[in-house]
């Protein structure tokens, strides 16, 4: 594709036309250049992957039962002793000296970030990263799970209020005759400064030491749309929470992936509220993914579970699989991560239940969605992008048409997909989805390679820019008439 010669671009934008039209052109060019390509997929150019992050290796250790996890492209156990995996989660006790308070109010590592040496923490964190991720060529998912406090003062409510209380006490003990307003101001400022430093410098350390890894914090960004019991619940993120997410630009700029979470309550099984809850959480993460200083949109991996939040062994219904995993894929996420705790492996019976579900309804649905995403990427985007809904609220999903495909489980535990997309299937995909091109590609079907990149990694063809200029100028002239 030929780029517009420098002289032509100058002719379009800087000829002595009315200032308003010139500003309009610059504004539109800036808007177009702000569109970011997707980061190249983490695994074999697959547009949507499934990763496993549960301690089911214990099923083999305790009961000699091997779980078949072949439907997952990436697998990692969160157990303390496991290392060298391609899905790594760092809990509070595994990465440096993370400060927090127990439920009894006992401080661990100083309790508050402003009470702990950041340099000592980072030195220990570097050792922990080398232990859990020994390979410098690690290119998997690196997730930091720090949930005891949030870096923004206003978000430390309920049980997290102890961090505000202790921060106030710290200031009042240091200074005599200080007003309540000054205590609040100083406590907030010192806490947020230290909290930011802890989170920002820790993830920067991870990215520097394992630069190919996809580093991010679990549950960030959060939509805080938990009021699912409200009448006429829409799932939308409260406006103040969207603004607070905007204020975390330092965190998004330090991350190389985003890891929001969608956990479903049993009381909302098969509910439309579950769909709304999931949809807005994923959509908010996708919004944030484009707001960073990176040349590409950060990949979004949505954490979910096999079962409901209160009963992890009561597995998600088919409808709730669609409302969580299917919704994530259709909106443009890079994949899902299935998380689980020791409940899944507490008995041989539980291990058997998990294995049975993964190799039946759950596995079949994962294969359905991941394969449909591949078909759509190949057909619409020439394997150079992922398919995203044209209308984000529409009930259109990346599913294989059962009239064209048949999914069956083989004796060795693998799922076999038979069939091919019909012309009608492909036409329906084209009608309902569009392409989000990967880095280095552009165009409606991502077939064109980007020959030169601006700040966003995108370029404009000469015909596109000329057409744009003509349209803007014509519009301006019609306004003048």
UniProtKB/Swiss-Prot annotation:
Q: What GO molecular function annotations does the UniProt record carry, in alphabetical order?
A: chondroitin hydrolase activity; hyalurononglucosaminidase activity
Question: What are the disulphide bonds in this sequence?
Answer: 59-351, 223-237, 376-387, 381-435, 437-446
- The UniProt record lists the keyword Glycoprotein: yes
Q: Keyword Amino-acid biosynthesis: yes or no?
A: no
Q: Identify one Gene Ontology CC term for this UniProt entry.
A: cell surface
Q: Under which EC number(s) is this enzyme classified?
A: 3.2.1.35
The membrane-topology field of this record reads: Multi-pass membrane protein
Give the sugar-modified residues: 64, 115, 232, 343
Q: Where is the active site?
A: 147 (proton donor)
Name used for this protein in its record = Hyaluronidase-4
Q: What is the lineage of its organism?
A: Eukaryota, Metazoa, Chordata, Craniata, Vertebrata
Q: TM spans, by residue?
A: 12-32, 456-476
Native organism: Mus musculus
| InterPro entries, alphabetized | Aldolase_TIM (IPR013785), Glycoside_hydrolase_SF (IPR017853), Hyaluronidase (IPR018155)
Extracellular topological domain ranges are: 33-455
Catalyzed chemical reaction(s): Random hydrolysis of (1->4)-linkages between N-acetyl-beta-D-glucosamine and D-glucuronate residues in hyaluronate
The record's Gene Ontology biological-process terms are: carbohydrate metabolic process; chondroitin sulfate proteoglycan catabolic process
């Amino acid at each position: 594709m030929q780029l517009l010669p420098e002289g032509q671009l100058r002719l379009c934008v800087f000829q002595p036309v009315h200032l308003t039209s010139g500003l309009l052109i610059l504004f539109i060019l800036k808007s177009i250049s702000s569109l970011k390509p997707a980061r190249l997929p983490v695994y074999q150019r697959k547009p949507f992957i499934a990763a496993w992050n549960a301690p089911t290796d214990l099923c083999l250790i305790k009961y000699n039962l091997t779980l078949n996890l072949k439907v997952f492209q990436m697998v990692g156990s969160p157990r303390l002793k496991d290392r060298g995996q391609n899905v790594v989660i760092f809990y509070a006790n595994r990465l440096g000296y993370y400060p927090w308070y127990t439920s009894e109010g006992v401080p661990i590592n100083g309790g508050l970030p402003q009470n702990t040496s950041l340099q000592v923490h980072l030195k220990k964190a570097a050792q922990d990263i080398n232990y859990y991720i020994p390979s410098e060529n690690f290119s998997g998912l690196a997730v930091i799970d720090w949930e005891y406090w949030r870096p923004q003062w206003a978000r430390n409510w309920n049980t997290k209020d102890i961090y505000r209380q202790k921060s106030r006490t710290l200031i009042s003990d240091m200074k005599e005759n200080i007003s309540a307003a000054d205590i609040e101001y100083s406590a907030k400022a010192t806490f947020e400064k230290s909290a930011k430093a802890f989170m920002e410098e820790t993830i920067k350390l991870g990215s520097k030491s394992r630069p190919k890894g996809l580093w991010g914090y679990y549950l960030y960004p959060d939509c805080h749309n938990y009021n699912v019991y409200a009448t006429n619940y829409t799932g939308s993120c409260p406006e103040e929470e969207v603004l607070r997410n905007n204020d975390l630009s330092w965190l998004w700029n330090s991350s190389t992936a985003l890891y929001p979470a969608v956990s479903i309550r049993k009381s909302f099984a098969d509910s439309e509220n579950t769909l709304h809850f999931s949809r807005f959480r994923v959509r908010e993460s996708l919004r944030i993914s484009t707001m960073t200083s990176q040349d590409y949109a950060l990949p979004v991996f949505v954490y979910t579970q096999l079962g409901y939040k209160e009963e992890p062994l009561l597995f998600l219904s088919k409808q709730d699989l669609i409302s969580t995993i299917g919704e994530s894929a259709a909106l443009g996420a890079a994949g899902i991560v299935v998380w689980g705790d020791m409940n899944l492996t507490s008995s041989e019976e539980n291990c058997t239940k998990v294995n049975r579900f993964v190799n039946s309804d759950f596995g079949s649905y994962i294969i359905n969605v991941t394969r449909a995403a591949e078909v759509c990427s190949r057909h619409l985007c020439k394997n150079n992008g992922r398919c995203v809904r044209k209308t984000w609220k529409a009930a259109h999903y990346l599913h294989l048409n059962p009239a064209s495909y048949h999914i069956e489980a083989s004796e060795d535990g693998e799922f076999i997909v038979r069939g091919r997309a019909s012309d009608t299937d492909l036409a329906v995909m084209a009608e309902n989805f569009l392409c989000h091109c990967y880095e280095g590609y552009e165009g409606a079907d991502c077939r064109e390679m980007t020959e030169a990149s601006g700040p966003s990694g995108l370029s404009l063809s000469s015909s596109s820019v000329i057409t744009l200029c003509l349209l803007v100028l014509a519009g301006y002239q019609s306004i003048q008439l």
